[in-house]
Amino acid sequence: MPELRQTCLDLLCLADPNDKALQVQAWGAQPWAVDTERALPEPAGIPGRPLRPVLMAHTDIKPARLTTPEGHAGLLHAVCHIEKNAVDLALDVIWRFAGMPHDFYLDWWQVAQEEALHYTLLRDHLRSLGFDYGDFPAHTGLWDMAERTRHDVLARVALVPRTLEARGLDASPAVKTKLVSIGDHRAGEILDIILRDEIGHVAVGNRWYAWLCAQRGLDPVATYPGLTQRYQAPRLKGPFNLAARAAAGFTAQELLQLQAPSSTSTPASINSSTQSAALTAH
């Protein structure tokens, strides 16, 4: 019987994102041995990355107009890059953090499989338009937060699924509207699949954040602002997809705080354009 955490580390090290997504999906939901206590040594060079896309600060990425083929494909590429990084993050949280309950690892393995599907759907759609993943520059925002939270599983689940990925719940409807407005109904269908699954992924983050807070004797709501400050998480700007956030397990108190004037200040890293929301959501 294969061991899940070592397998996820091996997959994370793969440089080819297409091969990585294929292998994650091929492993599937088979019976796994899970060594929850073993501290795995960290190899150099993770995550494995291809030579393309070129990585740069998101503020240096200048998307073309959406009504051009390059602008259309560029927006899809930005979302595809988010999903590629989401595969890496799900694999990383499994191998990196020992000592969690068995179900923690199985939950994130399910997330990894769904993120791999999302990446594949978007990559295939890009190819149908004459482009491919790697044809446009991309940023490292999601993995940068992973690096900052690499030593604390509480910070990781608080600030990746519950913060950056939850921003994807907010951005998804507007991105879908833009793509459908230029006639890309297939992209709209894919984004519907992603939104459905991402609600579940954020719910996994919420569930394990609450569990970890309970284990450490912390109040989840009171603890969160301190984590965002310590790890330099971006403040989020509305509009917020409150229905999706509620479905993902955010409490009524959290949703009310999210709508408070102090929580909707615009940080330098987020602007009001739909395309930039897609670029910076993760």
PLM feature spans:
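Non-heme di-metal
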Residues: 1-282
